[in-house]
Every structure is written in structure tokens, then in C-alpha cells.
Regions:
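Helix N-cap/beta->alpha junction signal
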Residues: 15, 89-90
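Phosphate-binding/catalytic loops
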Residues: 84, 90-152
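Hydrophobic structural packing positions in well-ordered secondary structure
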Residues: 8, 59, 86-87, 137
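Conserved active-site segments centered on acidic
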Residues: 1-80, 146-152
């Protein structure tokens, strides 16, 4: 089983969008028994809160199913239990390192790296642009799934 953890600041916008999008495309590919997907935050600010309404609205618009969930903070155990920890931006990477330490197993990847880009996935909490975030998330998840399919 390949395990993917999407990580952003609060676990209510970008990482949850990525979690639900990835679950959707994994299911469509018939790989739900082979790929496990979850998400978490680097901060504690939104712990216990559900997915942001803007993320839900965009997922609804795109026909991506989601469920009620509670934001949670990433842990050291997550580093050991997941194969891929996908960060949305450089700040997530710095904050994740404070929690898990060094990435000795090379499991941490920037989301846009899967499409050959080094830039961040912009946070719609600040930009208000859930369309742009969805475009980045969907492109990076599609590419990540193709990479994983080659390995399983």
C-alpha cells in the first residue's frame, strides 16, 4: 500500500483539496486498495475545524466528493507511516522540518515538483482564488498518480 499525506498550513484549504481530489482520481483508477490518502497541517490554528467552505464549493463545482473531517496536525509518526509527504509551499517545508526533523528517507516533496515546477501552490485563504489552487492541485495530483502507477 502506497500512503500519501498532503500537508499545508491549516489543513482546511489546499491539503484537503488535494486529499479529496487524489482520493477521487485514485478511486476512478481502481486503485483504492493500493493507495491511501490523508492530509494534515503544520500549524495548530485550525485543528478540529472542517474543510474551508471555499474548498468545498470548488470541489462541488468540479464534482469531487468529500466528507466532513477535522483538521489535524502532522506528527513524527506520520513521517514514518507515509511514503509521500506532499507540501504546498516552502513555509510548509520549514515548519514540517521542525516537527519531523530531517527528511532522511527523502519522503518530502513540493506539490508542484511533480509537474516540473518549483513554485508554491498559492494559499486561497489569502488569495481567495480557489480556481487557481484547484488547477495546481489537480495537475500535481494527476502527475503524482502517474508516477505511483509506474511503481505499483
Amino acid at each position: 500500500m502506497t500512503k500519501i499525506l498532503f500537508v499545508c498550513h491549516g489543513n482546511i484549504c489546499r491539503s484537503t483539496m488535494a486529499e479529496f481530489y487524489m482520493k477521487h482520481i485514485v478511486d476512478k483508477a481502481g486503485l483504492s486498495d493500493s493507495i491511501y490518502v490523508e492530509s494534515a497541517a503544520t500549524s495548530h490554528e485550525e485543528i478540529g475545524n472542517d474543510t474551508h467552505y471555499g474548498t468545498k464549493k470548488k470541489l462541488d463545482e468540479m464534482g469531487i466528493p468529500y466528507n466532513c473531517r477535522k483538521a489535524r496536525q502532522v506528527t513524527v509518526d506520520d513521517y514514518h507511516n507515509f511514503d509521500y509527504l506532499i507540501i504546498m509551499d516552502e513555509n510548509n517545508g520549514r515548519n514540517l522540518k521542525r516537527i519531523i526533523g530531517d527528511d532522511v528517507d527523502s519522503k518530502v516533496f513540493k506539490a508542484m515538483s511533480f509537474v516540473g515546477e518549483s513554485r508554491d501552490v498559492k494559499d486561497p485563504w489569502y488569495t481567495g482564488n480557489f480556481d487557481e489552487t484547484y488547477d495546481d492541485v489537480s495537475r500535481s495530483c494527476d502527475a503524482l498518480l502517474e508516477l505511483i502507477k509506474e511503481k505499483i
